[in-house]
């Protein structure tokens, strides 16, 4: 066993002494040592209950003959970090999470690992570490939050973000907003819609690195605790059979993940996270692959923010197994892939009798919400290397649109203009110098997009940025424009009043300025250099790659 490097032989007597200092017996030290990576904290609503999940995991490990050893991981709440300097640090935390787990699991050579994340960057960060370490491992997340609301109807966190604009517009009172803030997020769990955290937890299940139900079983249920116990027991079986993450995550698993992502209408952040995750296994996932899969995969679900359903509804309708079963009927999922159950996907679906239980929540592949997937990749003179839009959440009026550029060099300037009533129908808000390097950190633009929706402009105004978006964003929100402005991208050449052509069906995003004029602008163009006081962010800006390749560190 891997842990024998730390526990076995004459020379390791001092090591055993330190383990005894933890209260471990000789018998416990001789058993397989299982690292339990727990991202619990008292800051993030999606992580506040993870100690309960960890205790269940450890009980499962002990029941199956192992010795669990828990250690922590950081986690950022993107909702709390939104619209201030804290958001610069969210995406960089993904790499720090992966690196810190590599440090812990190498310095202390565990035989197996159980990963317990829940929210936005903790899930991809842990998946990256899982594939990097490639020892028997399993993931079990904390589960989704239930939707909130009152007798008047359901709400979630995005309802509150958009309500800010409604109050500014005069459509809602502060008293009504205060009531919504107290009811929209009713308890622990990852925010209730198909936002980034829940999308990535569904992806972990789809990849075969988590047990069925991981993406959708609500956080507050006993079923979630039982799932955690099963995960603890299952990792011991994976160890016995030497089933490692890289034996599960193959090119076929990559294709499955992207297909399910498109069927779900998942967060655009998957276009950053999945390439980074699969890259740890030596697998390439390009923007062209995303678009190729999207063009042939039907969009079966419209969960919040694209629709009124939530993750709890997806779970009741059959969950990820039902979505995969429906895609399998059309030959869009390869069911021969291995999973952490120790069985193939086909065997799992058969055991679960996977099927759609509510065709309103999970549409038939014969009658989807749309014939194409939730995400589209756009290219053109404004984004030669690509840009990303959640087309399943775009109003029909904005699918093809020529708009007038309103140019801002930061999120804060743009948000102030929206809230100040300075944005008009037909405008395309350009927010630049918010990319991975230029931000630095590629902040999410949820506050501006929510303000657009709240101000009643969702069907009339586009937002185009080299930054990124929350999974809760809806509307004509086009992000990840590459190359970014800080790297000399054409988004840096846009001027106030320029015309922008958005053509999502044709996959085009063009700056309607002739080549001669663009060349003249480029001759005098000097990218804006923002002052960066944080040493971490300065290092990040030097190391990070383009959003078009997952905003990973340079290898």
Curated annotation (Swiss-Prot):
Homodimer. Binds 1 [2Fe-2S] cluster per subunit. This cluster acts as a Lewis acid cofactor. It holds the Pfam family ILV_EDD_C. The keyword Transcription regulation does not apply. PROSITE patterns: ILVD_EDD_1, ILVD_EDD_2. It comes from the Bacteria. One of its GO terms (biological process) is isoleucine biosynthetic process. [2Fe-2S] cluster binds at residues 119, 191. Its cofactor is [2Fe-2S] cluster; Mg(2+). Keywords: 2Fe-2S, Amino-acid biosynthesis, Branched-chain amino acid biosynthesis, Iron, Iron-sulfur, Lyase, Magnesium, Metal-binding. The active site is at 470 (proton acceptor). The modification N6-carboxylysine is found at residue 121. InterPro entries: Dihydro-acid_dehy_C, DihydroxyA_deHydtase, DiOHA_6PGluconate_deHydtase_CS, ILV_EDD_C, ILV_EDD_N, IlvD/EDD_N. It catalyses: (2R)-2,3-dihydroxy-3-methylbutanoate = 3-methyl-2-oxobutanoate + H2O; (2R,3R)-2,3-dihydroxy-3-methylpentanoate = (S)-3-methyl-2-oxopentanoate + H2O. It is an enzyme of class 4 (lyase). Functions in the biosynthesis of branched-chain amino acids. Catalyzes the dehydration of (2R,3R)-2,3-dihydroxy-3-methylpentanoate (2,3-dihydroxy-3-methylvalerate) into 2-oxo-3-methylpentanoate (2-oxo-3-methylvalerate) and of (2R)-2,3-dihydroxy-3-methylbutanoate (2,3-dihydroxyisovalerate) into 2-oxo-3-methylbutanoate (2-oxoisovalerate), the penultimate precursor to L-isoleucine and L-valine, respectively. Transmembrane segments: none annotated. This is Dihydroxy-acid dehydratase. Its EC number is 4.2.1.9. GO terms for molecular function: 2 iron, 2 sulfur cluster binding; dihydroxy-acid dehydratase activity; magnesium ion binding. It comes from Nitratidesulfovibrio vulgaris (strain DSM 19637 / Miyazaki F).
